Curated annotation (Swiss-Prot):
Assembly behavior: Component of the 30S ribosomal translation pre-initiation complex which assembles on the 30S ribosome in the order IF-2 and IF-3, IF-1 and N-formylmethionyl-tRNA(fMet); mRNA recruitment can occur at any time during PIC assembly.
Pfam annotation, one family: eIF-1a
PANTHER family per the UniProt record, alphabetical: TRANSLATION INITIATION FACTOR IF-1, CHLOROPLASTIC
GO MF annotations in UniProt: ribosome binding; rRNA binding; translation initiation factor activity
Ranges where the S1-like domain occurs: 1-72
Entry function: One of the essential components for the initiation of protein synthesis. Stabilizes the binding of IF-2 and IF-3 on the 30S subunit to which N-formylmethionyl-tRNA(fMet) subsequently binds. Helps modulate mRNA selection, yielding the 30S pre-initiation complex (PIC). Upon addition of the 50S ribosomal subunit IF-1, IF-2 and IF-3 are released leaving the mature 70S translation initiation complex.
Species annotation: Geobacter metallireducens (strain ATCC 53774 / DSM 7210 / GS-15)
Taxonomic superkingdom: Bacteria
Keywords: Cytoplasm, Initiation factor, Protein biosynthesis, RNA-binding, rRNA-binding
Protein name: Translation initiation factor IF-1
Amino acid sequence: MSKEEAIEVEGTVIEPLPNAMFRVELENGHVVLAHISGKMRKYFIKILPGDKVTVELSPYDLSRGRITYRAK
């Protein structure tokens, strides 16, 4: 378990990158590098450019995150 809670923010996928990584623009204008969470990878959730997603950011490195949800 992590000592610090993750920061959840909304964003939009800008571009897909290799190895299930994505460049995501957050609501506040910042651009982060995000990978897909394990459950999304397991159930083959497809993410395309333009999709609205929820990203968890670590308080230690705000430039990287994990995509935990794709809005319908």
